[in-house]
Swiss-Prot record:
Belongs to the universal ribosomal protein uL11 family. SMART domains: RL11. Disulfide bonds: none annotated. GO terms for cellular component: cytosolic large ribosomal subunit. Forms part of the ribosomal stalk which helps the ribosome interact with GTP-bound translation factors. One or more lysine residues are methylated. Part of the ribosomal stalk of the 50S ribosomal subunit. Interacts with L10 and the large rRNA to form the base of the stalk. L10 forms an elongated spine to which L12 dimers bind in a sequential fashion forming a multimeric L10(L12)X complex. Keywords: Methylation, Ribonucleoprotein, Ribosomal protein, RNA-binding, rRNA-binding. This is Large ribosomal subunit protein uL11. It comes from Dictyoglomus turgidum (strain DSM 6724 / Z-1310). NCBIfam families: L11_bact (TIGR01632). One of its GO terms (molecular function) is structural constituent of ribosome. One of its GO terms (biological process) is translation.
Length: 142
């Protein structure tokens, strides 16, 4: 018989730098999970992606064991890195903060494809372009 799920927790944590401090401690502590065990497992799983924020979905079972699935970094983080900007524009329609080539948009879409609900790469690219526009990042050909 499969284990009974008592909770699912979604967090966005820096790769390789999860600690028992908030937000990890309070989120997992209420389910009685061994927080250090999760931190060690998460840090080992994300060791190669230093400097990125990695979303993680943790499934907690009745016997206080857990499993987790890491996702790809948020599109906004990947776009900020590609454009070389610290943050998006406060007024995206008026003030542009950076430029990204369409080829880079395609790379990001290919990376995010498994997490997006898009059927093909073109649809995924349009989603990423929409995110870029809402951040005030201009898309240039190339």
């Amino acid at each position: 018989m499969p284990k009974k799920v008592v909770g699912k927790v979604k967090l966005q944590l820096p790769a390789g730098k999860a600690t028992p401090a908030p937000p990890v401690g309070p989120a997992l502590g209420q389910y009685g999970v061994n927080i250090m065990e999760f931190c060690k497992a998460y840090n080992a799983a994300t060791a190669g992606q230093e400097g990125m924020i990695i979303p993680v979905e943790i499934t907690i079972y009745e016997d206080r064991s857990f499993t987790f699935v890491t996702k790809t970094p948020p599109a906004s983080d990947l776009l900020k890195k590609a454009a070389g900007v610290e943050k998006g524009s406060g007024e995206p329609n008026k003030v542009k903060v950076g430029k990204v080539k369409r080829s880079k948009i395609r790379e990001i879409a290919e990376l995010k494809m498994k997490d997006l609900n898009a059927n093909d790469i073109e649809a995924a690219m349009r989603m990423i372009e929409g995110t870029a526009r809402s951040m005030g990042i201009e898309i240039i050909e190339g």
